[in-house]
Structures are given as structure tokens and as C-alpha cells.
């Protein structure tokens, strides 16, 4: 015998009423995305859950991939047998042998297929008695707090037997809450913020500003690698590279150093706003944390936010750096984030940045930056990639 299925249970999406079908389809699509490395594995919707058929594939890497998918409340490794009592008994016995340290157990039969002739209570008794006899005193029944709960789920297509429940990523399926344009810097914070948004159902498109030759190809590859890490949580991610060298050198030349960071951030947000509107995206996000640096004070955020009417989401706003670092390590982005390749935010970094920049002063300095021309040129030079878990390729259609 071999565990040949994984039963996936829904999380919050089960509470979505009339939209449940839509959420289920999104979750199924996201599950199929993370299972692409396993060509024999199939996933399908059936009887109020998603069933993953392993088809002789090792269950451990498949279960590990499923554990990352938002929208999954829990999952169980399952053995499928025919709707025959003897097969159920032997199946339950096999599942218990996978828990050698267990001292107590119970059988919980669910006869969803009402044409099966043995009712649930009788199944509990018949299967439990068979297991007790096989273990000859090594196991005891505990119906209240068993070490192992053997669930026997009788369906028309067959009986699924499980003996353990594993926690999923919970949250909402990626894509169920709409799209967000996320500013991905290449540091520790922004990938964590993107992951948090994905957990609330947001489909993120990434926007990265790069400044060659001050930032090199390794810095660009680092951002691609971070984006690829995030695809394991649900789906392919579109990544946009905005050429920012000309804007950045122009700001450095024309703007007082105390306002350089503010004007640079305002230009980034201007460009992000235009890209988001072009693509029908309803919010912009980033990895800012309140008070972490000069550009992340409330006064700075207020002055920078002037460049858009779209919501600017900041999932890390109240998180400290240690918490963010621990989060990055948990989701697997930390080691890539700390690679020593500069991004555009570290170039020409002034030491006297204003922590309370004024809107009127910012607008005054922007008169010398040729804002409209520079924004148009940057957007015209965007390079867009579709990043998957396996490879990266240019988008087929011209996006801008």
C-alpha cells in the first residue's frame, strides 16, 4: 500500500458565499502552478475540496509545495481504497503503521455515499476492532484525545483514508483580491511585504528601478531571483524593469542633497502611478516601515504620496527590522536579499536627507528635473518579464 492522494481543505474562501466557485477555481489554478515540476501529479475539485492525485510521485516534495499555497487551510496525506470493508480495514491499519509512536487512536468514519450499506457508527466499530486485534495490545482507543485520528471518508468514487492533518498557508488564493503594483527594491523588506499581500489574495506585479552602469547585471538577476522565490506561493509574476539612470543623475545634479531622496521617491511613485493606471491596477505597494529611514517618516510619506491618488499599501509599516528579517528567513528570501549588489536607492545616497520634506519645496525643485519628459522616457524603456518557478521570459505582447 502507498499514500497516493493528498486532500486539500479550503480556508477563508469557503466563507465567500456566492463567490466560492470563483475562489475555488483560483485556488485550483494556483495549486496546479506550484505542481508543474511534478508532471504526473494531477489536481481536481471534487466533493467540496481539492484532491491531488500523486500517480506514483513521492508525496513529500508535493506536500512541501502545497504548504506554500495561500488559500489552503490544511491538507492530509490519503490512501484511496475501494468501497469494501476489508479494504478499509487494511487501509486504516496501514495508515496507523505510519505513526509508530502512537499509543492511542480513534476511527472517524464519514459515509457521504449513502448507498454504501454499512453506516458510520458500524464502520467505526468494525475498523477499530480490526486495528486493535492487529496491534494486540500495543494501541488503545481514545475517542476524546487520540494520538491519531483515522478518518475514513466514503465517497461514491472510493474511500479516502487519512491519519493526520497538516496546516496550510491559510489566507486567500493569490489573485482573489485583485492586482497590486509592488515596488521591489532587492532588499530584505520589499519581498516580505509582497508575500504578506499575496497572503491576502493580491496578485502582485513587480516594479524595479535600475540604474546601469551604477547597478550591474548581478543586481538585476538578484531581483529576478527574489521574484522567482515568490512564485512558489501561487503563480507566475510579471516583473517590470524601469531604466532610472538618467532620472537619478539628473536629480543628483539639479536638486539639493537634502531633497534628493524625496524627489527620487516622488519620481518613482509618479512612474508607478502611470504604469498602474495603464494596466488597470488599483493600488501600489512597497516595503516601507515607519521611521526606518528618512524617506519613511510620516512627513516624507505624506509628501511622496502626493504623486498618486491610488492607495499606497505598506504591509510592514509597524514591523521592526528583526521581525522582518525573521519573516524573510522563513519564506526563503533572506539569503538572496543580502547579496551585496547595489540597487538604485543606495546610489548617490545623501547624508542630510530631510525627514520632514515639504510639498511646496519638492514641487519647486522638480521644476529643474524635466518631470514629464523624464517619466515618458523611463516608461518607454521598460523591460517586462514573466517570472515562473522554472524560467523567465520576455512578455509576448508589447505592454507599453
Swiss-Prot record:
Compartment(s) of residence: Cytoplasm
Domain named THUMP: residues: 60-165
Pfam families: ThiI, ThiI_fer, THUMP
Pathway terms, separated by semicolons: Cofactor biosynthesis; thiamine diphosphate biosynthesis
Keyword Oxidoreductase assigned: no
E.C. numbers: 2.8.1.4
Binding of ATP, residues: 183-184, 208-209, 265, 287, 296
Record keywords: ATP-binding, Cytoplasm, Nucleotide-binding, RNA-binding, Thiamine biosynthesis, Transferase, tRNA-binding
Record-level Gene Ontology MF annotations: ATP binding; CCA tRNA nucleotidyltransferase activity; tRNA binding; tRNA-uracil-4 sulfurtransferase activity
Reactions it catalyzes: [ThiI sulfur-carrier protein]-S-sulfanyl-L-cysteine + a uridine in tRNA + 2 reduced [2Fe-2S]-[ferredoxin] + ATP + H(+) = [ThiI sulfur-carrier protein]-L-cysteine + a 4-thiouridine in tRNA + 2 oxidized [2Fe-2S]-[ferredoxin] + AMP + diphosphate; [ThiS sulfur-carrier protein]-C-terminal Gly-Gly-AMP + S-sulfanyl-L-cysteinyl-[cysteine desulfurase] + AH2 = [ThiS sulfur-carrier protein]-C-terminal-Gly-aminoethanethioate + L-cysteinyl-[cysteine desulfurase] + A + AMP + 2 H(+)
Function: Catalyzes the ATP-dependent transfer of a sulfur to tRNA to produce 4-thiouridine in position 8 of tRNAs, which functions as a near-UV photosensor. Also catalyzes the transfer of sulfur to the sulfur carrier protein ThiS, forming ThiS-thiocarboxylate. This is a step in the synthesis of thiazole, in the thiamine biosynthesis pathway. The sulfur is donated as persulfide by IscS.
NCBIfam families on file: tRNA uracil 4-sulfurtransferase ThiI
Annotated protein name in UniProt: Probable tRNA sulfurtransferase
Organism this protein belongs to: Shouchella clausii (strain KSM-K16) (Alkalihalobacillus clausii)
Gene name of this polypeptide: thiI
Amino acid at each position: 500500500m502507498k499514500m497516493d492522494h493528498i486532500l486539500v481543505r479550503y480556508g477563508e474562501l469557503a466563507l465567500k458565499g456566492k463567490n466560492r466557485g470563483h475562489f475555488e477555481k483560483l485556488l485550483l489554478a494556483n495549486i496546479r502552478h506550484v505542481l508543474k515540476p511534478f508532471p504526473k501529479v494531477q489536481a481536481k475539485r471534487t466533493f467540496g475540496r481539492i484532491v491531488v492525485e500523486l500517480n506514483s510521485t513521492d508525496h513529500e516534495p508535493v506536500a512541501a509545495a502545497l504548504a506554500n499555497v495561500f488559500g489552503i487551510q490544511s491538507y492530509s496525506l490519503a490512501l484511496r481504497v475501494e468501497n469494501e470493508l476489508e479494504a478499509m480495514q487494511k487501509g486504516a491499519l496501514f495508515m496507523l503503521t505510519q505513526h509508530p509512536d502512537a499509543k492511542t487512536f480513534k476511527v472517524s468514519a464519514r459515509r457521504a455515499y449513502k448507498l454504501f450499506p454499512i453506516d458510520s457508527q458500524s464502520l467505526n466499530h468494525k475498523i477499530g476492532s480490526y486495528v486493535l486485534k492487529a496491534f494486540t495490545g500495543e494501541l488503545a482507543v481514545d475517542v476524546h484525545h487520540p494520538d491519531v485520528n483515522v478518518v475514513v471518508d466514503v465517497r461514491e468514487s472510493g474511500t479516502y483514508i487519512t491519519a493526520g492533518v497538516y496546516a496550510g498557508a491559510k489566507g486567500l488564493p493569490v489573485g482573489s483580491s485583485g492586482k497590486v503594483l509592488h515596488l521591489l527594491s532587492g532588499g530584505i523588506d520589499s519581498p516580505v511585504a509582497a508575500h504578506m499581500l499575496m497572503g491576502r489574495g493580491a496578485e502582485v506585479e513587480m516594479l524595479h528601478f535600475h540604474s546601469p552602469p551604477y547597478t550591474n547585471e548581478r543586481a538585476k538577476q538578484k531581483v529576478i531571483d527574489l521574484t522567482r522565490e515568490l512564485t512558489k506561493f501561487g503563480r507566475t509574476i510579471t516583473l517590470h524593469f524601469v531604466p532610472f539612470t538618467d532620472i537619478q543623475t539628473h536629480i543628483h545634479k539639479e536638486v539639493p542633497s537634502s531633497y534628493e531622496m524625496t524627489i527620487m521617491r516622488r519620481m518613482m511613485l509618479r512612474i508607478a502611478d502611470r504604469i498602474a493606471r495603464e494596466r488597470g491596477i488599483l493600488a501600489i505597494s512597497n516595503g516601507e516601515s515607519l521611521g526606518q529611514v528618512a524617506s519613511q517618516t510620516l512627513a516624507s510619506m505624506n509628501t511622496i504620496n502626493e504623486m498618486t491618488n491610488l492607495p499606497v499599501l505598506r504591509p510592514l509599516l509597524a514591523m521592526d527590522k528583526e521581525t522582518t528579517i525573521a519573516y524573510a528567513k522563513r519564506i526563503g528570501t533572506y539569503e538572496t536579499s543580502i547579496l551585496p549588489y547595489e540597487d538604485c536607492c543606495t546610489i548617490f545616497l545623501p547624508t542630510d536627507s530631510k525627514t520632514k520634506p515639504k510639498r511646496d519645496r519638492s514641487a519647486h525643485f522638480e521644476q529643474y528635473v524635466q518631470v514629464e519628459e523624464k517619466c515618458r522616457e523611463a516608461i518607454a524603456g521598460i523591460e517586462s518579464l514573466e517570472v515562473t518557478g522554472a524560467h523567465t521570459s520576455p512578455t509576448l505582447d508589447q505592454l507599453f
